[in-house]
Amino acid sequence: METPELWQFTSSHFNEKARWALDFKRIPHVRHSLIPGFHVPVVKRMTGKTTVPVLKLNGAAISDSSRIIEALERAYPEPALYPADADQRSRALDLEDYFDEELGPYIRRWIFHVILPHPEFVRAAFVSHASKGAQLAHRALSPLFGAIMKRQMNINPISAEAARGKTMAAMDRLAKELRPSGYLVGDRFTVADLTAAALLSPLVRPPEFPYKAALPLPEPLAKIRDSLSTHPAYRWTLQAYAQHRGESAEVAGATNLSRSKVDASRAATTER
């Protein structure tokens, strides 16, 4: 069996979801870290799409974090992220879908509204792994990236406030859905827990998150984080990371890819 290869953005919650599944299952894999915008020709050649993460598994290029986990469950069934019990499995997949649709896009919009006025932090979070040349190119293009991201992701004060509300609603639901075991389904960690925790990671910033920005959080984001630190979903996310994030299963051979030609117009809607 070929070593799986993951094409990713380092600081992305949907990418973290796929990455965590690989690590949880202890699957040795190679990671290719991309820069938003610069990633387009690389990913489009593999899938015909422009979204990451993309997993190359047994010759197939799979996009979408949920489809990646589904493929990993078939190829590497243990340790399982899908419950064996049919009712529990249905609940786990329903919750995965809920957090994918009702949390993932909205927490992203809210967080980007907060951090885009701080381009140095954005570069530290998304580009610090890249070559110096790629970092310089991104720096030169950062005003363009910011404007395009605002337009394509519909980022403005009104939409950001609505996204904040959706994020809070998802956090409240997470707290209500927790079983007495402390998990969302049954008495063990499943795809539902992994999805909820990974998608909350941009806000919670767990210490176990594998890629940390080289700069401190911008003050507005730090204040938001502090204000939510007593929320049950926030505390639960920290616990989920502490108990289940584990060590990386990445193996040698990873690359940091960039291209001189960047499609900035596609930089904003590129993860799922």
Describe the predicted segments one by one.
Residues 1-134, 244-251, 256-267, 271-272:
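GST-like domain detector, emphasizing the conserved glutathione-binding G-site
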Residues 6-10, 56-60, 95, 99, ...:
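Conserved aromatic-histidine-acidic binding/catalytic patches
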Residues 104-214:
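GST-like fold's C-terminal all-alpha helical module
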Residues 155, 159, 221, 225, ...:
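Short amphipathic alpha-helical segments at helix-loop
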Residues 199-247:
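Short His-centered aromatic/hydrophobic patch
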